[in-house]
């Protein structure tokens, strides 16, 4: 089995020998030709054209470090436009040849990535299973009798099978998450609007989101950051915002009454294990009422939002109804029974449900849900295409209605070896803040990536787009009085960690709010102190540092892993007679002790 392509491995190869890009292209072509699944791609860049693209890249940008995705092979779902290649949306009669790239493809090409081909999908992105295509049904890389998940079926399988380093799909109801779960990879669904959908065949235009599949959070987040950003071509495009989450998150999990797995005892047990894994990571796991979210989810295929799918292709459907997959046609044509009045009633119902769901969601930093409650064989899905497909969307359909960010990660394996995944779902624009938690969960699962369960670099890198990290130790920690100075300035939490062992912590006298003073004493053997690393835009960092009052200042703080980052330090002369709290291990422990809160071991 071919090993997965990762950004780190490709960068290392290219740094040693830039001409290796031609070898990588040859490897990609050989892997595609040797693939046992003929339904992954609908169309491919011709072999000679892909080899020529590698030569052109070497000629125009000979330094691999000059472009962020230099020489990285990727694929896109075939409802995303690529200039000069047909867009079919898995419907041959609908096919057209666009003159311009979709915005996301344009950005990937500018970053130096090499397109391998366009992947299969449930026709018109209507389905979560991957069988609704005249080009065949891609299969789970773990067992060819089982569905790959959809609608972004080929995109997920292409990554999991090691044919490309990453791929793009689209996600309206869960199409960028369910296939990730069924193939043991990562699926990143951004906050709606963060990534442009210009040049994408719409399913439900008001809900559609372009997603990224990758072997790891490190790779997926890197790609997402490159393709996101406001685009005037897309009326639903928004400027990405930066919102943080607490270092010790409160996580919503399904109550026992809401844990529906349709008789799949293995998946039920794996979800219980996932909840326990979250607790082992230090997360506070709290059950919540899923009812309003389930009611929102049902609107997508049982309410007037079906009419939005009709609006996307109605002239074509009217002209060539027999060109559609029978199941897809039946679903979309059923929208004709809804009236304009029904559409407004649906909006009113959605608003009421969103109010209920928001009241629940605001109690948590993020939710941890099964990505899909079970998996089915291809033949079973074809025999019962609507009911079984609906099962896959039980825990995914609501997310875009709620304008939330979601990351699907591997979480375990059933007794028969098929993968199970979970999805972390956070408020909109917490995309970057959510990623470290998803990476930590993925790593703790031990599932690796793809059919080979390969161990890959999991943690996302901190964005390097003019942002600066700052280590905070006291009143700026998550949940503390001055934390808003970070979040209001566009800051997001990178990680919660500890300092090296040679730091000491004191309570500064006469400060409001109360603040600690951190100093380094070489040779001191301490426990290391709890800190948080935050990322700030450069302009916010300057204002933030300028406002720091004496005796505090900034300098390099060495973390427990040996990395040094800019952080709060204190002038030592101000600590004469100050109370030392180093033994407590951190500022929060000191505050808890002052309030009479006891911790294990105390």
Show where each model-derived region lies:
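Serine-dependent amide/ester hydrolase catalytic core
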Residues: 9-15, 29-30, 120, 246, ...
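Acyltransferase
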Residues: 20-26, 55, 265-289, 313-319, ...
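Short glycine/serine-rich loop segments
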Residues: 101-102, 106-224, 400-423
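An N-terminal boundary/leader segment
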Residues: 1-55, 450-452, 456
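Short helix-loop capping/hinge segments that flank enzyme active sites or metal/cofactor-binding pockets
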Residues: 68-91, 248-254, 304-358, 410-419
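Glycine-aromatic micro-motifs
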Residues: 439-440, 444, 449-601
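A short helix-breaking turn/cap at a secondary-structure junction
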Residues: 189-269, 273, 292, 355, ...
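Acidic/His- and Gly-rich active-site-bordering loop/insert found
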Residues: 50-52, 60-133
